[in-house]
Amino acid sequence: MDDVIRKRIEAVRRGEVPEGYSTGDAGVLPADWSSKPLSDISSVITEQAGDRDLETLSISAGIGFVNQAEKFGKEMSGKQYSKYTVLRKGDFAYNKGNSKKYPQGCTCMLKERDEAAVPNVFECFRIAVGDPLYYEQLFVHGFMNKQLARKINHGVRDDGLLNLTNEEFYSTVLPVPPLAEQQKIAKILSAYDRAIELKQKLVDELQSLKKTCLVKLFPRVGSDVPEVRFPGFTAPWEQRKVGTFTSVLSASRVHKDEWRTEGVPFFRSSDVVSAFKGDDNERAFISTELYEELVKSSGRLEKNDILITGGGSIGIPYIVPNNEPLYSKDADLIWIKKSEEHVSQFLFAYFTSQGFREYISGISHVGTIAHYTIEQVKDTPVSLPSIAEQSVVGSFFSRLNQLITLHQRELEAVQQKKKALMQLLLTGLVRVNV
């Protein structure tokens, strides 16, 4: 990023209007761009489905158009369907239903189908002037959200829709670059969309492979061998309870007023769940002095020990990655020590399998809160092969998890780069060569 662009961005952040730019309802834009209400660049779609046989779609927040029967489990009646609005490829539908991800509703473009019918509660339109793909990027970016938030009356109607009239929706003002620039912006951002789509597909395929392997590489109920084995192993697996091949413990209690903002990491169930999902979580700590006092009686967590959640989202595992100081919350997390009779990576993989999920759902104390206790962990049955086979199976899943994490991070990096580019290109803070 050159100095001119950097200074331009800094000026806008300070609330200033850079040279060559102007400000209006659509924000700070290049002086040679115009800004127009959506009503000036679009036409409202009123065509109804009638008795035509069209696929019916709905909008799912964060996904886009989905088959309505698959979403709701039923088709609409003929009387309702006849009033549905007909969309064609390139048309848009605005869903006034608010959600956590889209508090001002969301606008989607029909891209994967040539024609479809959508509920007439959606506001449907097509771009009459300009490049629809450019405007799609504006809608995806949520460019209208601030304006819509000012127009929407607080709360929702009895039908769950936002208090926003069609006139208010179409009065939102959008940036309108010259057509050639619209097309170039859309081309750049669409290329990122394709890269994101391909990377997401790879992540999904790896997740699907993992799910399949978790079924095939562990014995089914009633069997002592898995469906698929690595070469060189033929001996039956032995079913044992966790408490017979390792120690199952709990940490000493730490009161909340002893938590700190720095020091020794203090793991709770939320930290384990976040680590399992690859999400960030606000961390808690305890002082080094308290940690040293506690481990005198409870012992130290060591590399390859396993923590498994006993409250909240129960049965979620975490392998301690190193011997650096770490302490865990007592009832929240059950502590499974490493031992010579099991391989931690193998046991971790088992704790992520469908067989284990089915087992734990049947034995956990479920009331208002589910619990997985120390005694239940000790009594949990696990089919164990030889240490050598455990090592091979555990290493396979460990490498597969690392590969999934790598591609997930690459996906997130591309998504973040596109998000930053949208902010710059759709406001004209960075201009494209046409």
Predicted segments with their positions:
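A short beta-sheet element
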Residues: 85-144, 157-158, 268-270, 285-352
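DNA target-recognition patches
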Residues: 18, 42-78, 110-111, 117, ...
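Accessory (non-catalytic) regions of SAM-dependent nucleic-acid methyltransferases
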Residues: 1-22
